[in-house]
């Protein structure tokens, strides 16, 4: 296990700089076996040194590319494939270890109606693109998004939802809540709520682009 200070969602591709000795050992073990390791969010504490508190749900990553430097550090590119749930934490030896359970998104395919999901995902994609375009106009360092192709096959729709989540770049709290949601329909509704909250924030910013400006005081009676 490689706990991190960020939420890694299924479908993500993550660059990692591995410099701490215990995680160098983890990489060496992975490179000798199936190149897979798990990650969860550090809910309290730091990535370096141990003594952290960790969430129970995370992602299973596969090392796609790896380069070891002369001083023993590693640069990795890893892809997240599936959600995992930690059943029990084991002793660090020397890196964090755990017994985990894979939580595939296709456990309940009947919970996904292809026609309904395709329409809802396409609508959410349009709203997210509008949000990002507005944020870029205000100076955010993000790329303007193109249209995301929405599949019609039931098996691909759950993965497409994760692509939309990544496009929104939600807070760690929102991303973790989505990751912990086992039911895909509930996850879609939760994500739609997160998109709406983001829209409300943007509407407030458009109405008052600089709430600290003394030339634009807030009416205390409002």
Cite the ranges covered by each PLM segment:
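N-terminal low-complexity, acidic/polar interaction/targeting segments
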Residues: 1-222
């Amino acid at each position: 296990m490689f706990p991190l200070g960020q939420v890694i969602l299924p479908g993500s591709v993550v660059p990692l700089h591995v410099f701490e000795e215990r995680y160098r050992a983890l990489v060496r073990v992975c490179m000798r076996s199936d190149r897979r390791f798990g990650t969860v969010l550090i809910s309290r504490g730091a990535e370096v040194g141990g003594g952290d508190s960790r969430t129970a749900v995370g992602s299973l990553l596969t090392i796609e590319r790896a380069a070891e430097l002369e001083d023993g550090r590693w640069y990795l590119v890893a892809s997240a494939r599936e959600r995992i749930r930690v059943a029990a934490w084991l002793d660090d030896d020397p890196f964090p270890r755990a017994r985990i359970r894979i939580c595939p998104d296709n456990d309940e395919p009947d919970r996904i109606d292809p026609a309904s999901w395709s329409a809802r995902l396409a609508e959410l994609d349009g709203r997210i693109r509008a949000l990002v375009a507005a944020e870029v106009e205000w100076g955010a360092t993000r790329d303007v998004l193109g249209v995301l192709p929405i599949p019609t096959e039931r098996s691909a729709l759950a993965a497409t939802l994760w692509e939309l989540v990544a496009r929104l770049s939600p807070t760690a709290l929102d991303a973790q809540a989505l990751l912990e949601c086992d039911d895909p329909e509930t996850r879609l509704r939760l994500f739609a709520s997160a998109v709406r909250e983001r829209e409300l924030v943007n509407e407030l910013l458009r109405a008052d682009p600089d709430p600290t400006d003394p030339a634009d005081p807030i009416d205390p009676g409002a």
